[in-house]
Amino acid sequence: MTIDRRALGFGGSERAVYAADPWTTRGRLYPEDDSPTRSDFQRDRDRIVHTTAFRRLKHKTQVFIAQDGDHYRTRLTHTIEVAQIARALARALKLDEDLAEGVALVHDFGHTPFGHTGEDALHEVLLPYGGFDHNAQSLRIVTKLERRYAEFDGINLTWESLEGLVKHNGPLLTPDGVGTRGPVPQPILDYCELHDLELATYASLEAQVAAIADDIAYNTHDIDDGLRSGYLTFEMLEEIPFLAGLMAEVRARYPHLEPSRFTHEIMRRQITRMVEDVIGVAQQRLSLLRPQSAADIRAADRMIATFSDAMAETDRQIKAMLFKRIYRNPDIMRIRAGAAQIVTDLFGAYMASPKEMQSHYWVDHIAGLADAPKARHVGDYLAGMTDTYAISAHRRLFDHTPDLR
């Protein structure tokens, strides 16, 4: 039976002219036959969900270590929240929802165990060998490290998905070829030699909504988790005018709410207002730009999906509060120091004796390598660990493992 792919409603019921088009993608590094029932962007999304890297997000954390409790966000729950917000934004702006969701689902693949603490520690030990960047690591995972298919390494995503993964926060190069945020990580440059991701342009609008959805999600859930842990109080939230306004609104409508419901009512309003703000800014910028294709979005001189100046200031205030009250809290700092020690110790142990990695693939793969390529493979192995696995690996190799509670 022949299936009419164009009649299946891929990517949303209606797409604007500036949306990424699943029928005219720039293809994959390794050509494949079309699916009769899914668009290329749907296939990307599905491949992302079925990876080992996606499953590992369940046991990777951002601020609160996995042992802290069952109700704190993990990388997986955060990723699902980001994907939901990204899809809502994409629908409102008539974009390809599948591409936006796929970029949101893959954006955290390269994160190490123990959140940014683990990344900082891994970057420090890898500095003599080029350092570590979680965005570049995400690219390595989906183009090299996932080994599922008979004909290629990685999961062979479309150009649009890879572009969104690499450039969702904006161009990596100026038109003159200078890094916009410092030197471009070598793994990204290496891949672009095979499949040019046009690092000097903006990404699709689908990738941009995935990026701003990430900001919305983590600001909101870090407040929620901070209140749950006791590191934040409602009084602290009232120091920020935007949050104080939301709290007053909830109190006026529900004067006797219990704390947990009060928190939820604040958080849902925060997400709604931020989403509405992004949609308003995007619509305004689109009306000025008048793009006729996704290429016009890439050629623009600024991001289209972003906060207004007022909401950007609120975003800065929230981040400053989270940094002061949570990320720099003495208890969190003690835990972070222990987590960094675990990563540093494991790197040293595996570099000195790769057999301690207890994986035939990894041991065989780095046998006889010089220090630089060996370090990169050890970094790949460490970056793929979950919090719980890293802790258990450290306990096996060392007499004392830091207490991360």
Swiss-Prot record:
Disulfide bonds: none annotated. SMART domains: HDc. InterPro entries: dGTPase (IPR006261), Diverse_Catalytic_Enzymes (IPR051094), dNTPase_2 (IPR023023), HD/PDEase_dom (IPR003607), HD_domain (IPR006674), PHydrolase_assoc_dom (IPR026875). PROSITE patterns: HD. It holds the Pfam family HD_assoc. The keyword Hydrolase applies. PANTHER family: BIS(5'-NUCLEOSYL)-TETRAPHOSPHATASE, SYMMETRICAL, SLR1885 PROTEIN. This is Deoxyguanosinetriphosphate triphosphohydrolase-like protein. It comes from Rhizobium etli (strain CIAT 652).
